[in-house]
Amino acid sequence: MAKGGFPGGFNINNMIKQAQQMQEEIKKMQEELMQKTVEATVGGGMVKAVANGRKELVSIEINPAVVDKDDVETLEDLVLAAVNQALRNAEEMIASEMAKITGGLNIPGLF
């Protein structure tokens, strides 16, 4: 049996090293995701929401043509749809980046 190992070739020291390396890669990725953005545009380009890789809203752009004081509800719906889609896009971006590091393993609690 190898030093630090278990029957069957399992080596706890190697596993710890791999976990530490993955942790460092995840930290680096989190820093990189802060700089990346995704966007969502709804209403034929009338409302655009931009989110970063921390699922934070960075900006909202509203075309003045969609602003109607007699129909605020439509604008509210468009803003809500754009924000929700931008946040979903951020989730997908994060999942894609995480899969590169974890090899597709779903590790709860990382984000």
Swiss-Prot record:
An example molecular function term from Gene Ontology annotations: DNA binding
Intracellular or extracellular location(s): Cytoplasm, Nucleoid
Keyword DNA-binding tagged: yes
Pfam families, per database record: YbaB_DNA_bd
Any one GO CC term of the record: bacterial nucleoid
Source organism superkingdom: Bacteria
Main localization (coarse): cytoplasm
Keywords of the record: Cytoplasm, DNA-binding
Role of this protein: Binds to DNA and alters its conformation. May be involved in regulation of gene expression, nucleoid organization and DNA protection.
UniProt family annotation: Belongs to the YbaB/EbfC family.
Assembly and oligomerization: Homodimer.
Name of the protein: Nucleoid-associated protein Teth514_0034
Organism for this UniProt entry: Thermoanaerobacter sp. (strain X514)
